[in-house]
Amino acid sequence: MPSLKDLKNRIASVKATQKITKAMKMVAAAKLRRAQEAAEAARPYSQRMSAVLANIATAVEADVAPALMTGTGKDDVHLLVVCTAERGLCGGFNSQIARFARDQARKLISEGKTVKIITVGKKGYDSLRREFASLIIERIELRDVKKVGFENADQIAKKVISLFNAGEFDVCTLIYSEFKSVISQIPTGLQLIPAATPVVEAAETTQTAVYEYEPDAASILEDLIPRNISVQVFRALLENVAGEMGAKMSAMDNATRNAGEMINKLTLSYNRQRQAQITKELIEIISGAEAL
């Protein structure tokens, strides 16, 4: 049985931890609001850009379409770009993305495909290297980046495009966590290359005028598709930041409440043991008095 001093020290230690988790929750809540606004603002732009590409693609013949849109004509080699957080203490956020990526890799391997992986974020690398160390061709860390910007996404996109141009893969899938709410972040896979053509509404595809493209539609696609890849990566990074902050706020809230419950239990044990010790001392005093 722990002594009164040990219990007192444990109570003080848990209280100190509770202060830290409470502060981390407040910081995450403040960052979440900004991250959520950024993620929600990026969605319409990325969706509309994909729709514009789909509309322009209808005016381009397959034999002159950019390779980034048509692909290599094969699907033998798959590149998975897995985006996770740089730090932990955010519940199951990172493990969910890693599990989703792991399942995708296993599925492709079982189908006889060759899989290559690029990890964006330290936690993704730490989780996947245990099983797929030989498949990871590059790790990208954004630990020193205070605020994720478009330039970070553009660098990742350019790296992916250069690998495609070098013939390193046939299909590229971006894996990230789509932010739904503070308690809901859904791991998602988005095909980057060949550029996935989104399904657009009939009202959007019905042409009410004849468009002339200057330069030609194929040249416009050649320029827009790399930009679209950068935009989609940027959106994924923003979604991840919002999801990470939401998961961290929820995790720190749970930790703060658990610390409170532990403090109550330890305080109860401390009071009971102290009362028992006082009772014992009183009995000894009374017994000594009776002996006299």
UniProtKB/Swiss-Prot annotation:
Membrane topology according to the record: Peripheral membrane protein
The keyword Cell membrane is assigned to this record: yes
BP GO terms, sorted: proton motive force-driven plasma membrane ATP synthesis
GO molecular function: ATP binding; proton-transporting ATP synthase activity, rotational mechanism
PROSITE patterns tied to this protein: ATPASE_GAMMA
Protein location: Cell inner membrane
One of the record's GO cellular component terms: proton-transporting ATP synthase complex
Keyword line: ATP synthesis, Cell inner membrane, Cell membrane, CF(1), Hydrogen ion transport, Ion transport, Membrane, Transport
InterPro entries the record matches: ATP_synth_F1_ATPase_gsu (IPR035968), ATP_synth_F1_gsu (IPR000131), ATP_synth_F1_gsu_CS (IPR023632)
CDD domains in the record: F1-ATPase_gamma
Endoplasmic reticulum found in the keyword field: no
Role of this protein: Produces ATP from ADP in the presence of a proton gradient across the membrane. The gamma chain is believed to be important in regulating ATPase activity and the flow of protons through the CF(0) complex.
Family: Belongs to the ATPase gamma chain family.
Quaternary data: F-type ATPases have 2 components, CF(1) - the catalytic core - and CF(0) - the membrane proton channel. CF(1) has five subunits: alpha(3), beta(3), gamma(1), delta(1), epsilon(1). CF(0) has three main subunits: a, b and c.
Protein name as it appears in the record: ATP synthase gamma chain
Organism the protein comes from: Agrobacterium fabrum (strain C58 / ATCC 33970)
Gene: atpG
